[in-house]
Amino acid sequence: MKTFVAKPAEVKRDWFVVDAEGKTLGRLATEIALRLRGKHKAEYTPHVDTGDYIIVINAEKITVTGNKAKGKIYYHHTGFIGGIKAISFEDLIKRAPERVIEKAVKGMLPRGPLGRAMYRKLKVYAGTEHQHSAQQPQVLDI
């Protein structure tokens, strides 16, 4: 018996919509990353992007456990000397709630061109409205 290897042209990708309201950030992000990679499919191939498209709504209503709302700090650097910036989870969820889920999922995907292709299939929206109704996404209960 030969090992099955998926071909990029033959991969069937579905669209799923996930409601983040009341969900824990890390638990939701791991499930999303798994589905973006395609590891839930029998035809998973490590060097081929076999994952599905994921739409996340209600990103502003995601929760974290413990004292992480105040204690979790997100860092980025501007590129200039002394240009390190920090923002807490609490402030980032007010300013850009989509970025919280995007950063969590991006850290769980592989680095490189394949990981960037997987990340592009993630669509995150702060509210309940999204612009992908033409793709007829299925509701994914996580």
UniProtKB/Swiss-Prot annotation:
- Entry's Gene Ontology molecular function annotations: mRNA binding; structural constituent of ribosome
| The keyword Ribosomal protein belongs to this UniProt entry's keyword annotation | yes
Query: Keywords, A to Z?
Result: Ribonucleoprotein, Ribosomal protein
Q: Which Gene3D superfamilies match?
A: Ribosomal protein L13
The task this protein performs is described as: This protein is one of the early assembly proteins of the 50S ribosomal subunit, although it is not seen to bind rRNA by itself. It is important during the early stages of 50S assembly.
What InterPro entries does the database record attribute to this sequence?
Ribosomal_uL13, Ribosomal_uL13_bac-type, Ribosomal_uL13_CS, Ribosomal_uL13_sf
Give the residue spans that cross the bilayer. Answer: none
Q: How does it assemble?
A: Part of the 50S ribosomal subunit.
* Protein family per UniProt: Belongs to the universal ribosomal protein uL13 family.
* The protein, known as: Large ribosomal subunit protein uL13
GO BP: any one term:
translation
Q: Name one GO cellular component term.
A: cytosolic large ribosomal subunit
UniProt keyword Ribonucleoprotein present: yes
Source organism, top-level taxon: Bacteria
